Amino acid sequence: MSDKTPRKPTAFRLEQPARVSAASEQEEPRHPRAVKDLEQITPQADVFDLTDDEAAELEILDPAFEAPERKGWSLSRILFGALGILVSFAIGIWTEDLIRALFARADWLGWTALGVAMVALAAFAAIILRELVALRRLASVQHLRKDAADAAERDDMAAARKAVDALRTIAAGIPETAKGRQLLDSLTDDIIDGRDLIRLAETEILRPLDREARTLVLNASKRVSIVTAISTRALVDIGYVIFESARLIRRLSQLYGGRPGTLGFIKLARRVIAHLAVTGTIAMGDSVIQQLVGHGLASRLSAKLGEGVVNGLMTARIGIAAMDVVRPFPFNAEKRPGIGDFIGELARLNSDRNARK
């Protein structure tokens, strides 16, 4: 035990902490005032978005369409024309000899062959007439493009009305343009400038068609990109690109009211190819596009998926060129689509496919 004397019990007063009410903790309400520093949400950067430099370089590879000058008779045209006449004579002589031989054998065989020949001739004449109408329709679209551009440049109201009336005629059978045509009819008398009338007609009538055309081009590019990514043979890739491009050209022409026949489609495809050849798109192939995109998008993808993006871009470029050729009015009020509008979607499509693997 300790030697210390135990202390006596004593009472202690404990100091109670001051109670603070919840109301006292709150600050006095502030007066209403305008908030200047609003909270801003910074969107997350997409790795597949193009930089300004990449978009500018892609636009350089995608110039606007300029109608080629009509050339006179070339040697190739004279050659094929002469061969066509000779083949027609040969078919006619062969048919005549066949009918004469059948008449010599039996009259009913001769009359049957003559009737079949007349039916074939009538069908051939109907096909030629249909093709000529389709060619005339395509030619009228090309003339309308030129007339609309001239009317907008000169601000000629009379020429603008004539061009808009021709556009109404072309779009009369297209249901997507019904609302735009109705609105244009109600506002035509209120517009006094030819340039404004051209821009209004382009906006109200061609905008829904342009939206559908972009969808067609994007879907075709996606299909080509997927087939290229999963295909193991280059011949399959080339064949599918040609097939998809031909179908895209025809569908775009039908969308804008062109409705080309066989000869019309061949002529339309030649114009698209000529446009691509002038801009150098076909010749650049893998070299320029891979140099352009290789340090950006394609470097983030595998080699095979990069080839899919390249082929998809080529298909998109063909679709854009086809839009330039078959569109009744040139792009003025509406923004012309470019390769940059499709490259992000193609890259995301291939990257998602690579991630699923």
UniProtKB/Swiss-Prot annotation:
Task: Give the UniProt entry's GO cellular component terms.
Answer: plasma membrane
Q: Where is the composition biased (Basic and acidic residues)?
A: 27-36
Its predominant location is: membrane
Presence of the UniProt keyword Membrane in the record: yes
Q: Do you know which InterPro entries this protein is assigned to?
A: DUF697 (IPR021147), UPF0283 (IPR006507)
Q: Which family does it belong to?
A: Belongs to the UPF0283 family.
Please list which residues make up the signal peptide.
none
Ordered alphabetically, the record's keywords are: Cell inner membrane, Cell membrane, Membrane, Transmembrane, Transmembrane helix
**The protein's name:** UPF0283 membrane protein BSUIS_A1077
Question: Could you tell me which residues belong to the region Disordered?
Answer: 1-36
- Tell me where the transmembrane regions lie: 78-98, 109-129
Subcellular localization is given as: Cell inner membrane
How does the record say this protein sits in the membrane?
A: Multi-pass membrane protein
Q: Name one Pfam family in it.
A: DUF697
Native organism: Brucella suis (strain ATCC 23445 / NCTC 10510)
